[in-house]
Regions:
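Outer membrane beta-barrel strand-and-loop segments of large Gram-negative receptors
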Residues: 384, 517-519, 564-572, 678, ...
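Outer-membrane beta-barrel translocator domains and adjoining extracellular loop/strand segments
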Residues: 212-213, 278-283, 363-379, 388, ...
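Membrane-proximal, glycine/serine-rich, low-complexity loop/turn segments characteristic
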Residues: 21, 63, 77, 84, ...
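A short, solvent-exposed loop/turn motif at the edges and junctions
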Residues: 48-51, 73-89
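Short, acidic Ser/Thr/Gly-rich low-complexity loop/linker segments typical of extracellular
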Residues: 48-63
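Short, ordered, surface-exposed loop/turn motifs in non-cytosolic proteins
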Residues: 33-47, 123-125
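Signature of Gram-negative outer-membrane beta-barrel scaffolds
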Residues: 533-637, 828-830
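Conserved C-terminal beta-signal and adjacent last beta-strands/turns
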Residues: 797-801, 805-815, 830-939
Length: 939
């Protein structure tokens, strides 16, 4: 391994003498009739023939400039509302080019002002990228990037997550480069809106797919923040500190140092107000996920995520991946991060970040659960829990792009994450059968866990002299390791008509889990004839996962003084090996606005499962699948396009799903894995239509996606009608549940999303309307009978955001969500519930520096538990005064939860139960805060 690293380093640095020819390009946009400067015009330079695009806006003087433009043939395009667009094709020699005045012809008469102004272009469509003009959305002086994107059509910011075009934003780039790794929250909450020129929304593809142009469907929704030209040589940021009642405090800041391509940012934060300007990385599954991923046997996650049927969350976001947003409960946060970006010797583009955060969470929950059972008796439970957790996260990300020459480049992406978590919890659960208390369980649990992820992607791409002929190879490696221990004590009481029964359990567990993966992918593209090309692909993956979970039962008889005994039922030593070969061929067509590709691949999988304890076996399975994929994009014109994608893929069960080790963290809800699980096959079809009318400043977006899964991995649940012996020494009390994953057909899903946005000059505001309809059918087995949980979710959202001035900013919004849930097995548990949230956000700067900010929200709930207040009013109010030069300093007093009605409500729906969850939240407090904004330009 060390020898290979040395070879790679020698290869990298031996190429330092090879330089690409790059230069600068500038010009000025002016009106043809009066030669007046045109500000905020959109200027794009597009490479010919591969259509790579770089875009910026003209300054107040009408001027624009592009740095580091490579030698080649380009098309320049300039657009602005009220003018005819212009286009020119030119050759660039890689040195410097001044294009002089570029004249735009007005489509209507203009005023006689020195500078031509007006409502800026709201958005424009550039292939698969939607670009918003930041100057078209007025925000106050201290607004963040998150405040800016809230105003943009189709963008929704809620519960710490940003969604656009119906998908969650996974990454935010700054001028095309990562900021704080893969954490979108860090960029949006910490970067000031005034530094932003454009925001681009697109589906980011892998480095290999972007190089070859072959869309493989493995995309993530990404925002690219294009900074203003005058902010690229500046230092800016802010620092703040505050203290309030109940010993509440808040301190932090971010400072950015920009000098051309060299950029450095440092951010820090400390508070006990549940403020978190970043997303935590959850390697252990302890910060909100219900799966308990990576936890020792008996481990109890501190919270729950939604089941497959859908959910509503208040006070926390859905947890579906390692990056999670704010946690419910009372959270104390300390965080520090740095981000670095620069070009080295013209050939190297380097970006790196390090982030550290520490959180302490005091969480209390009340969970009302209704079970989906086909039995004469109704069954429900109430759980009351208290937990304390102490969590540390470190993460390091780096990206190095080496432009060897005009035909070759290399990208290296190393990543390292580390997490540790110490937690304790006390849980009391009562089970009621026909409204009579049947049993009660009290569990005292504590754990200490550590997790580490290390990965690296190495990509190399080569373009041959023949147009369209390319070759690429990518090597991806990863290693993960989780370890820890836990201790659990449970007291179980069961109530009968003639007598009561009680039992206790004391145990401790150890976890040692690790795995690695090596993936190599080769792609070669050959042009066949005009507009057609063929691509050949081969991929090889080797993955090994090992999980040792050992649980020891304490001896409860102090007189015998026996040592703890290893439990074979609660322990397992398991290993899973996967070898994958994929060979595929794609045919692509690209001409006159139509791009299409058809791919067929053959995937061979060999899965070997090895158990060493408590049973010894070695089992090997092989799977072979023909997998089609189709992609099409058609541009009707420069303002509208249609995109369609179909894919068939297979996924194999994880080691956690395969390993048959009993989890008895709750004696009333036991679970285990299933060694007999097979692969699952999924079909996905997605269609998306986008239209942007620059002249009318309106935008329309529509998306619909269908999903179908064969051999879907679901749950097989057994509910005991009477005390049942599952394993030797393991008793499932009456009303208890035992769950195991199974393969089952019949999973179907549909997602749809509509968005319309328009600038309304009459009220000088942007109006955004969005709607969505989601549908899912999730099959499962309950007491040997098939149940299909069907969920329909309808959501409507309307937002009016002001565009009046930088002193007055208001947003009026309302969101209505209607949810229908049906179960084929138990019709009596069919339910529908309605949630509506309406809010008014106001930020007003008046009399030269006085500030009032108000955020009022009404929440209405119908169809949830009777214990939940159907009407909740939340109001945060603050007053402040700006002072010092350019009003850079501010002193503000804030009243949080003026009406004392803050809450945290969650509805979780799974295949076998429905939960209504209430969590503790911050109560009313007052805070005095001082903020100073740093601004130093033209360094």
């Amino acid at each position: 391994m060390k020898f290979c690293i040395k070879i790679v380093l020698v290869f990298l640095f031996c190429q330092l003498s090879v330089f690409s020819q790059v230069g600068s390009l500038k010009g000025k946009a002016v009106e043809s009739e009066s030669s007046k400067a045109i500000r905020d015009a959109t200027v794009s330079i597009i490479t010919i023939p591969d259509s790579n695009r770089t875009t910026q806006s003209t300054r107040q003087s009408g001027e624009f400039s592009f740095d580091e433009v490579k030698r080649g043939k380009y098309l320049i395009r300039i657009t602005h509302v009220g003018y005819m667009p212009i286009e020119r094709i030119f050759d660039f020699d890689g040195k410097s080019l001044d294009m002089g005045n570029l004249f735009l012809l007005p489509t209507s008469s203009m005023t006689d002002e020195v500078t031509v102004t007006g409502q800026s272009v709201t958005a424009e469509l550039m292939g698969d990228t939607t670009q918003f003009n930041a100057s078209a959305f007025k925000t106050t002086q201290d607004a963040s990037a998150e405040d800016l994107v809230r105003k943009m059509p189709g963008v929704i910011v809620e519960d710490g997550q940003t969604k656009t075009q119906g998908e969650t934003v996974k990454e935010v780039l700054v001028d095309g480069r990562p900021f704080m790794g893969d954490d979108p929250t860090a960029a949006l909450k910490n970067l000031p809106a005034e530094m932003i020129d454009k925001i681009q929304v697109f589906d980011r593809r892998s480095d290999q797919a972007a190089f070859t142009g072959n869309d493989d469907g493995e995309t993530s929704k990404t925002l690219n923040i294009i900074t203003r030209a005058d902010m690229r040589n500046a230092s800016f940021g802010k620092v703040y500190a505050g203290y309030g009642t109940d010993d509440r405090y808040n301190a932090g800041g971010i400072v950015n140092f920009f000098s051309g391509d060299s950029r450095f940012a440092i951010l820090f934060q400390s508070n006990n107000l549940n403020n978190q300007n970043f997303a935590s990385e959850d390697l252990l599954g302890v910060m909100g996920a219900s799966s308990g991923r990576g936890m020792p046997p008996g481990a109890r996650p501190h919270g729950r995520g939604p089941g497959g049927g859908g959910s509503l969350r208040r006070g926390g976001a859905d947890i579906n991946d390692f990056m999670v947003s704010q946690q419910s409960g009372i959270v104390t946060t300390n965080a520090f991060g740095i981000n670095y970006s620069d070009n080295w010797a013209q050939n190297f583009e380097v970006t790196g970040s390090y982030f550290l955060n520490h959180t302490e969470n005091d969480r209390r929950e009340n969970i009302l659960r209704e079970y989906i059972l086909n039995t004469p008796e109704s069954q429900r439970s109430e759980e009351i829990s208290e937990s304390l957790s102490n969590n540390w996260n470190h993460r390091f990300n780096m990206r190095i792009k080496y432009n060897i020459d005009s035909s070759n480049y290399m990208i290296i992406r190393p990543r390292l994450s580390f997490q540790s978590n110490d937690g304790v919890s006390l849980t009391n659960t009562g089970l009621l059968i026909d409204n009579q208390l049947a049993n009660n369980t009290q569990t005292d649990f504590d754990s200490k866990l550590q997790g580490m992820n290390l990965s690296n992607d190495l990509f190399y791409g080569h373009r041959f002299a023949k147009k369209g002929r390319v070759f690429s190879v990518q090597l991806s490696t990863s290693y993960n390791e989780n370890s820890g221990d836990n201790r659990q004590k449970s007291i179980f009481e069961e109530y009968y008509e003639d007598e009561d029964f009680s039992d206790s359990l004391s145990q401790f567990g150890e976890l040692d889990k690790n795995g690695y993966e090596i993936e190599t992918e080769f792609e070669y593209t050959e042009p066949l004839f005009e507009n057609f090309s063929v691509e050949f692909e081969y991929e090889n993956t080797m993955r090994r996962d090992k999980s040792d979970k050992l649980t020891y039962i304490d001896n409860n008889d102090p007189e015998t003084l026996l040592m703890p005994v290893l439990s074979p039922t609660l322990s397992s030593m398991y290993e899973s090996d996967l070898l994958t070969h994929v060979a595929g061929v794609s045919l692509r067509y690209n001409n006159a606005g139509l791009m299409a590709s058809l791919r067929m691949s053959n995937e061979w999988n060999t899965l070997e499962n090895v158990s060493q304890y408590p049973n010894s076996f070695d089992e090997k399975r092989q799977y072979n699948n023909i997998l089609p994929r189709f992609f099409m994009r058609y541009e009707f014109n420069k303002e509208s396009n249609l995109r369609m994608f179909y894919r068939n893929r297979v996924s194999l069960p994880s080691i956690d799903q395969l390993q048959e080790v009993l989890n008895n963290s709750n004696p009333m809800n036991l679970s285990t894995g299933n060694t007999n699980l097979n692969e699952s096959s999924r079909h996905d079809l997605m269609m998306r239509y986008s239209k942007v009318n620059q002249q009318n400043s309106d935008m329309f977006f529509a998306m619909i996606a269908f999903g179908k899964s064969d051999s879907y991995i679901s749950k097989n649940t057994f509910v005991a009608a009477r005390d049942t012996m599952l394993y030797e020494g393991i008793n499932l009390p009456a009303g208890g549940q035992f769950t195991q994953p199974i393969n089952i057909d019949g999973f179907n899903s549909m997602r749809s999303f509509l968005s319309y946005g328009k600038y309304v000059g009459l009220i000088k505001s942007n109006v955004n309307l969005t709607g969505s309809f989601d549908f899912s059918q999730i099959p499962s087995i309950i007491n040997e009978q098939r149940n299909v949980a069907e969920s329909k979710n309808i959501s409507l959202n309307a937002v009016v955001s002001s565009n009046i001035s930088t002193e007055l900013d208001f947003t009026v919004s309302t969101t209505s969500m209607l949810n229908y849930v049906t179960n084929s097995l138990v019709k009596d548990l069919n339910s529908d519930y309605f949630i509506q949230k309406s809010s008014l956000r106001l930020n007003w700067i008046f009399l030269g520096g006085f500030v009032v900010e108000s955020n009022f929200e009404h929440q209405y709930y119908k169809g949830l538990s009777d214990a939940i207040n159907p009407n909740v009013y939340l109001w945060n109010l603050s007053f402040g005064r700006k002072f010092l030069k350019d009003n850079r300093a501010e002193l503000r007093i804030t009243a949080f939860d003026v009406l004392k009605q803050n809450n945290a409500i969650t509805r979780n729906i799974s295949e076998s139960y429905i939960d209504d969850v209430r969590s503790n939240v911050l109560q009313q407090y007052f805070l005095l805060n001082f903020t100073y904004n740093l601004r130093v330009y033209n360094l």
